[in-house]
Amino acid sequence: MFKLNRKKTELTDNYHRHSEAMIISCFFNPQNSVYRLKAFKLFYESIKHLNHTIIECVIGNSIPQLEENENIKRIYTENLLWHKESLLNKIISNLPAKYKYIFWLDTDVIFTNPDWIVEGVRQLQSNNIIQPFEYCIFLEKDEIKPSFSMDDIKKSFLPNAINNKVWRSFSANFVDTELWKNRSYHKHGHVGFAWGAKRDILDSVPLFDKALVGGGDHIIAHAAAGQIPHSCISNDFSAIIDIVNQWSSDFYGVVNGKIGFVNGEIYHLWHGDIEKRQYVKRHEYTPMTKDIVLRDENGLFITNEIDDVNIKRYFEEKEALEGKRKCFFRVRK
């Protein structure tokens, strides 16, 4: 089990605080990837001095990996599905009212701008939702910063065409280019890693939680921009497109296209090759999740059946594992 390291590092206390801002995240690692755990440790070192709430979701017979404290809690569920948005909604619903600005972050990212959260709150005075970064960079194994300069890359609005490890954020493109209207994921901007919104937006319309093999951020981005329907989403979520479009319309109704971003970069810490993420192929499994409607006592979707072998394989292959793979998907007795 990962225990919190109290020793200061170069990442500790680097980000500046805002009293009304709350960071929320979830962690699940049923494949027992040592690299995902390593990424979490680096991430946590960078945000542990800020207001934060994290849920570790222990799936099936997986072994808990995080030490619980007042900010890190643990819940259990049976089925291997993408529970991210359900977990985030659960956190938001239980937050004290004093937190007016919510930032939901993946637990494998590092920000270069120490004022990202303060500037994020500033952006949310005139916008309803933001991405708190302009560029995202996929790091190589064991890196904590890129091995290349961003100077020339930033001169292009299509950084991914210059270096396939770099994207501009969807929100940055929304603010100052027309690229957000493009149908190509590589051109319209990256939709993942980190978002922030006014608390009342998420209270009014909770995050879409039926993207059970992932992709919820993609739905959020196009919905916030009022792109309903959008070919990206119609193609990837055709099996559940009616509920996606209904949620998207509701979400746009409160966001109303008021989207912003924060200057700076975000580093994605390596825990598996990007080529193995199968961001497109994974949506082949969405039809398998269409009829999943049951939820457990924590509000997470369950099937009351053995996990689908194809979905299990997808989650296994997207992670970097050391040694012989073990089965972490037995149903708890």
Identify the role of each PLM range.
Residues 19-25, 47-54:
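Hydrophobic targeting segments
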Residues 1-18, 29-36, 43, 211-333:
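C-terminal catalytic/acceptor-binding lobe
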Residues 112-215, 221-226:
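Conserved catalytic core of nucleotide-sugar-dependent glycosyltransferases
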Residues 36-52:
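Short, acidic, metal-binding catalytic loop of nucleotide-sugar glycosyltransferases
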Residues 32-34, 60-66, 140:
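Short, charged/polar "capping" segments at the starts of alpha-helices
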